[in-house]
């Protein structure tokens, strides 16, 4: 069983839902990434999604685009991100880390080399935003050889055939993007999310995390009542962006603790 599957199994036994925060590696600067990862865990994160900076992050809204730009100013690339995970692993072996990014840096490194290096550094899963399931059998095979979970995005507009392909290929969890468009948008329709999750669960047996549009405890709590995991990215990046460097850890820690408390309120009632 993968570390991600182990975490979800433990949470199920505890009647809890997973909190999965996202940060971009190298934002606000490379020295802050590993301390931020530890802060996320102390504040209640179950799994960390770590973004690999990319110059053309087409699926991301302006907040996460800016975080990528800040990291790229410090020349943070895929090798640096893997080194950050390795550093995190020197003192945390139990919190899964999922790399989230785009295909280009992975292709530049090569599938086999990337998968081997990611495993060696302590990565648990990989979500490549711009790899549709129908085009990435070879990529997924390289991940599986290294016992890395291949994680996929689904959205309100994903066609049925692709949902079925994801159901066959995905491991760890599936990330359901609850809004059309780019990250950081608002206006989450919980009724629509509930109905879509019911549909997805008729095909997908692994946990489903919901993200995009979760900006506060109330929304996190509502989503936790529907999904297996709550994914929060843009709201955390905003906190990093607006806080002075000396206050970033405390500000992010406060936000994540609030989200954790809200999620646990609903989980404990089930």
Question: How does the language model describe each region?
Answer:
Residues 43, 121, 169, 203, ...:
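Structural motif
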Residues 198-205, 215-270:
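Alpha/beta catalytic cores of nucleotide-metabolism and tRNA/nucleoside-modifying enzymes
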Residues 21, 40, 51, 118, ...:
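Conserved, mostly hydrophobic/aromatic
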Residues 45-56, 123-127, 132, 174-184, ...:
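Glycine-rich phosphate-binding active-site loops on the catalytic face of alpha/beta enzymes
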Residues 14-20, 92-102, 143-153, 201-211:
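Short beta-strand/loop segments at the ligand-binding rim of alpha/beta enzyme cores
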Residues 19-33, 98-110, 149-158:
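Active-site mouth loops of central-metabolism enzymes
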Residues 30-40, 158-168, 210, 214-230:
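Catalytic cores of alpha/beta
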Residues 1-11, 30, 55-66, 73-88, ...:
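Active-site-adjacent beta->alpha loops and helix N-cap segments on the catalytic face
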């Amino acid at each position: 069983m993968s570390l991600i599957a182990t975490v979800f199994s433990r949470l199920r036994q505890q009647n809890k839902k997973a909190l999965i925060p996202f940060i971009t590696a190298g934002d606000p600067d490379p020295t802050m990434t590993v301390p931020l990862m530890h802060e996320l865990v102390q504040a209640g994160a179950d799994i960390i999604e770590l973004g690999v900076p990319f110059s053309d992050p087409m699926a991301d809204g302006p907040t996460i685009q800016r975080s990528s730009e800040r990291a790229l100013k410090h020349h943070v690339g895929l090798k640096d991100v893997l080194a950050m995970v390795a550093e995190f692993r020197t003192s945390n072996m139990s919190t899964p880390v999922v790399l989230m990014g785009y295909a280009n840096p992975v292709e530049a490194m090569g599938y086999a080399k990337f998968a081997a290096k990611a495993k060696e550094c302590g990565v648990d899963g990989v979500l490549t935003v711009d790899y549709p399931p129908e085009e990435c059998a070879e990529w997924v095979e390289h991940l599986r050889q290294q016992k890395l979970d291949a994680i996929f995005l689904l959205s309100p507009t994903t066609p049925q055939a692709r949902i079925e392909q994801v159901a066959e290929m995905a491991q760890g969890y599936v990330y359901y993007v609850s809004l059309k468009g780019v990250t950081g948008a608002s206006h989450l329709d919980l009724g629509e999310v509930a109905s879509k999750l019911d549909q997805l669960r008729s095909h997908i047996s692994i946990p489903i995390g919901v993200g995009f549009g979760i900006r506060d405890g109330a929304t996190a709590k509502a989503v936790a009542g529907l999904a297996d995991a709550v994914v929060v990215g843009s709201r955390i990046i905003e906190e990093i962006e607006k806080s002075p460097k000396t206050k970033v850890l405390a500000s992010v820690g406060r936000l994540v603790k609030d989200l954790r408390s809200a999620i646990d309120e609903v989980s404990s009632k089930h």
